[in-house]
Structures are given as C-alpha cells and as structure tokens.
Amino acid sequence: MEYQIIELSKEKWENTLIPIGYTTEEYYNITVEKKADGFVMEMKKQSFTQPVTHTPQEYDFPDRLYEPHWEKACARGIVQDEKLMAVVETAPEEWSNRLRVTELWVDESLRGKGIGHALMETAKEQARREGRRVLMLETQSCNVNAIGFYLHEGFTLIGFDSCCYRNNDLDRKEVRVELGWFLQEKK
C-alpha cells in the first residue's frame, strides 16, 4: 500500500495529541566528570535490569501539534479515515538559522514501512529549501530505538541537557539528547 504525505493545516490539526510512547530495554548512560583542566563526558549504551515503558499519560500528554511556543510550525503527515497515522512537525529557529523537528511519530501499525524515513526526508527537503544550516531534534537517552533511527538518517550528537526534565535526569537515565543533521554548505 502506498501512503500519501499531506500538509496538515494549523486550522484543522492544532492541539492534536501525538501519542508518543515507547518501551526500552536499553539506555545511553551519560556521565560528566569534572577534571582539573575541564570536563570528560561519556555517552555509552547500557541495559536496564528490566524493560522501562514511557507513556504519554505519565507526562500529562505533552506532545501536541502546533503548540503556541513553536512559532511558524508546519506539519505534514499521513491521515486515514480522518485519523492521524503519522506526522512530522517542524519549526524554524530563526536566530540560529536552524530547523527543529518538534514532533515525529508513526502509528505502530505503520512502523517498518519506511514512513518515518519519508517524513524525515520532507523535513530535510524543507531545511534545504529554506537554506538552514542544521536540521535538529530532541530525544531522550533512554529512547534507544529513536536514537538508532536518527543516526541511520544521518543525524549526529550535538549536545545534551542533563536537567531538562527534572533535576535528576542523569540518575533517572532520561537525559535530553540533541541530534543534528548538517546540510552541505555552499562553496
């Protein structure tokens, strides 16, 4: 079956819940060690003692389309019978000439069919068309499957925030990880 990616208008899709959740058996353990001459940081994949599940409910359903703080956001996705089945939302970061993927989600029934890749390609094309330096996104150090997908898509680690969600993110093994895909600079 072929799926068509369409523009999702703000008027129709604003505030639509994106039910992002996952179960993981692994995480990237991030350590930061202060040294006399600076810091040493390490991000190394490790296993949980038992699977960990994160649900939208535990975070009070934070992922929605066209949130007010994402100025000039745009969304594209797949809709079947008026139901959202997959989506990518992007928003420009004008001051740094970067484009941020604010949401990426594919319904479980459609995973493994290349839809995530196709959605990411639309974001990459938007970044190229707008002349952005970087396409970037946020995920969590415990979302190993997502990190693997993004690395496969050509993204690389550009940073992390060790207290984005709570003050003990490092201990909880849920650290905000920033990944970026760099566009080729014109010579």
For each predicted feature, which ranges?
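Residues that form or flank phosphate/diphosphate-binding pockets in enzymes
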Residues: 96, 114, 145
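Conserved phosphate-binding and hydrolysis motifs of nucleotide-dependent enzymes
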Residues: 82, 86, 114-116, 154
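Acetyl-CoA-dependent GNAT
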Residues: 10, 16-98, 102, 107-108, ...
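Conserved acetyl-CoA-binding loop-helix of GNAT-fold acetyltransferases
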Residues: 103-106, 112-129, 148-152
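Generic detector of contiguous secondary-structure segments
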Residues: 3-16, 132-147
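C-terminal "cap" of GNAT-fold acetyltransferases
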Residues: 2, 133, 140-144, 153-156, ...
